[in-house]
């Protein structure tokens, strides 16, 4: 059990996208976020109080959460100075990085000496089965994106919150470190051995009531040459009844891949749906979620209207305008 509240460590994140773990906690569990701590040159700012370790401890923070999802998940020497000091100040540490806290000898030694706990949420805690493709009861909705970090998690969380408010049976199913830190449960999909990834999603979304919806957090993109494998596992293992297409319209290239263009929503539709229908022949695309954070209000509304007219599906920014219309669309499934 990870003790709350948290002090969110931003490190030397180059931009806000790199701090998506911290952003997710701030937005969906604000009562868990006491403040932030960053290194010189950090390009991310959550708008929380910038604190020293001593100030955060005095404010009641229990765990220092590494809020940065950097490429490769490595723990730098600059970070370690802060992490060691945090342990010495009485903080537990929590991380979703691929480089595990427990595998860093200096951190492990200090944690043992101080009696603190190292939480690696990207470590699978279950021996997952190989997927068998057997149809399960209940309903499932999966968010798929044109790229990484376009709002797939936010879409699923917003839809789950809206459904809970309406009294509709639903569960957000976390598949990445941010979602796991928000909800306290889930599958760290990109740390699961490849042959068992689809099976882990079957495990995460078991038989349920016929009127219950699993809102499955999407990962990666079918079009991203680095991370498409996890997306395929979700598309097949999740057996979705409904897909939500997710897009960020101001991207000039794929995240971390400057030589690769971002696909259109039409391309995503035409690739994702046949793949999903391989596992569930009745799967439908029911709506579009657009991350309009870099657009002004009028520009965002105009863009959503254009997309809706072009695609023939409800198009919304669930964070900006709510997820009501996306939830309405599920009623027809």
Swiss-Prot record:
Signal peptide: none
This protein's name: D-glutamate N-acetyltransferase
Result of altering residue 177 to A: Loss of activity
Pathway annotation from the record: Amino-acid degradation
EC number: 2.3.1.312
Any single Pfam family the record assigns to this protein: DUF1611
Keyword Methyltransferase among record annotations: no
Its biological purpose: N-acetyltransferase involved in a deamination-independent D-glutamate degradation pathway, named the DgcN-DgcA pathway. Catalyzes the transfer of the acetyl moiety from acetyl-CoA to D-glutamate to generate N-acetyl-D-glutamate.
Enzyme class: transferase
Catalytic reaction(s) noted: D-glutamate + acetyl-CoA = N-acetyl-D-glutamate + CoA + H(+)
